[in-house]
């Protein structure tokens, strides 16, 4: 039988060890909570900073939406597009040479400048945004005769991404499949059949713009 004193020492030692473990666990838990709270605060501050940084382009999007689409058109469509194109980064460059917030190809921008000599450099945020919205307006006009307004945005942004010729071919594929080629879900349905089209990129692009728009304040 073990003597009482050694037994007491063992029990006390175990109690102290358990208390130390509990204190350590509590300290670790508190540390994790503090770290999580700090991360949340840092993230919120970063989001506020990002919103302030991108909001500086809002007056430009509003100005050229009104100029090229008229009063009543929701300017958020085009900011959402800029977010999808470049995260609203003025100096953005793509691997194929597209430039600026609206990721315009120099050849496309050159055509716009020929028609409108008042446009400045492609890397200037205002002119880049203006040119992107003007290009959207041309696509809007193209689809206007037979595509309902509620569907037309899909066709506009798809044409911007893949080229209007690709979307025309997609519409022909829908017609060949005896589907209504004026509705975007039918274009999505026949997309895999359209040759020379990286359709997954375009379909994702259109979805991303809508999601971006829904996340933006209308002010």
Mark where each language-model region is.
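Short, functionally critical alpha-helical segments immediately adjacent to catalytic or ligand/cofactor-binding
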Residues: 72-89, 132-133, 156-161, 209
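Short, charged helix-capping/linker segments at alpha-helix termini
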Residues: 65-73, 145
């Amino acid at each position: 039988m073990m003597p009482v004193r050694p037994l007491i020492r063992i029990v006390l030692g175990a109690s102290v060890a358990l208390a130390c473990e509990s204190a350590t666990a509590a300290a670790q838990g508190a540390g994790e909570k503090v770290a999580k709270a700090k991360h949340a605060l840092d993230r919120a501050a970063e989001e506020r900073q990002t919103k302030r940084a991108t909001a500086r382009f809002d007056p430009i999007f509003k100005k050229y939406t009104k100029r090229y689409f008229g009063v009543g058109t929701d300017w958020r469509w085009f900011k959402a597009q800029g977010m999808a194109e470049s995260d609203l980064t003025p100096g953005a460059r793509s691997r194929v040479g597209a430039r600026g917030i609206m990721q315009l190809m120099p050849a496309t921008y050159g055509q716009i400048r020929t028609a409108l000599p008042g446009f400045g450099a492609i890397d200037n945020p205002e002119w880049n945004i203006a040119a992107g919205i003007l290009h959207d307006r041309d696509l809007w006009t193209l689809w206007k005769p037979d595509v309902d307004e509620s569907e037309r945005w899909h066709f506009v942004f798809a044409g911007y991404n893949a080229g209007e010729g690709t979307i025309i071919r997609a519409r022909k594929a829908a017609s060949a499949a005896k589907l209504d080629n004026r509705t975007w879900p039918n274009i999505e349905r026949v997309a895999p059949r359209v040759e020379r089209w990286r359709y997954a990129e375009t379909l994702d692009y259109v979805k991303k713009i809508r999601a971006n728009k829904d996340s933006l304040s209308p002010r």
